[in-house]
Amino acid sequence: MSEQTQTCASEIQATNVAVQHPKSEKINLMNLTRQEMRELFAEMGEKPFRADQLMKWIYHFGEDNFDNMSNINKVLREKLKQIAEIKAPEVSVEQRSSDGTIKWAMQVGDQQIETVYIPEDDRATLCVSSQVGCALACKFCSTAQQGFNRNLTVSEIIGQVWRASKIIGNFGVTGVRPITNVVMMGMGEPLLNLNNVIPAMEIMLDDFAYGLSKRRVTLSTAGVVPALDIMREKIDVALAISLHAPNDELRDEIMPINKKYNIKMLMDSVHKYLEVSNANHGKVTIEYVLLDHVNDGTEHAHQLAEVLKNTPCKINLIPWNPFPEAPYGKSSNSRVDRFQKTLMEYGFTVIVRKTRGDDIDAACGQLAGDVIDRTKRTMEKRKFGKGIAVQNH
């Protein structure tokens, strides 16, 4: 094992503080991939195809009551009720933006995470969290200011998709656009929770569950290089890189992880990923949040073009979304336009991401949730006070 991989393993272990459950507790079937569920049924002396049936009930029909699973015999249903449960995070608060975006505070133990549904004309994207809080301390991100609490379990990750699907109507004809895309861009750094994120994404891709195509599941990372190297051997999904700076000096300042894995190391790892991935037509999405007079100058655009000159990519420019006590300002439209045009002159595809849900703090970089605040800041500044408590579906 390489020194970098060993370092990554220790980092993942350091953040692996998910809630420990007593052995006597029931098995949450949402923690299992289909293969793991088939193994469970084999241990029970049942045919493995029962796992396929159960997966369909849970994820195709949104069913969490064994009694309603009509093609599973009563004896097996009773056996399942004794040892297993189907349990997703519940919604404690819901907020709806004027642009159709919905943000949910979902309860995970005694804490909350945030999940965002973003409908568009041709798709509907669900932004999913992977951790309670975040350990990476990026200076422009609200989540990072709260510190890190713990990793989410598989059921807490895939359960966000399940719960959102129940609410917006994936399991029935409601006139609301169903979820077509899932992005691991919510709270947390997904590559520091690989042991739970990869199985959750496997369920998203599984035809017996959500059956999403590889290009419709996107993992976004700030650049935990050894973990990205591990992931490329495990699963193929679309990749997005939170770059946000065109040189190491600036990236060190705004994204401390760069001091450990610099831009060259990160881009080398990205190229290796693209060599084996066909999830997004051999391209990576580069995310770049624009901070006024920090990283949005013409010289920064030229530097970014140099960094990306040999990388098949699409560039998403993200207008920065303010949060309390943040040390930055939002770039003017003229600076955004100039930055975009400079990159386009090099031949890059450059999109300025439309800000969605900023009136409910659901926009990029604004998610914080009700976590145990390691920085001792109160969460009363959040806008969830304007939300409504909801009955769980």
From Swiss-Prot:
Q: Does the keyword Transmembrane apply?
A: no
Task: Tell me which cofactor or cofactors this protein depends on.
Answer: [4Fe-4S] cluster
Where found? Cytoplasm
Which keywords, in A-to-Z order, does the entry hold? 4Fe-4S, Cytoplasm, Disulfide bond, Iron, Iron-sulfur, Metal-binding, Methyltransferase, rRNA processing, S-adenosyl-L-methionine, Transferase, tRNA processing
Q: Provide the function of this protein.
A: Specifically methylates position 2 of adenine 2503 in 23S rRNA and position 2 of adenine 37 in tRNAs. m2A2503 modification seems to play a crucial role in the proofreading step occurring at the peptidyl transferase center and thus would serve to optimize ribosomal fidelity.
The record, for SUPFAM superfamilies, names: Radical SAM enzymes (SSF102114)
What residues does the Radical SAM core domain cover? 120-359
Name the GO terms of the biological process aspect: rRNA base methylation; tRNA methylation
The answer to keyword tRNA processing applying to this record is yes
- The UniProt gene name for this protein comes to rlmN
Entry protein name:
Dual-specificity RNA methyltransferase RlmN
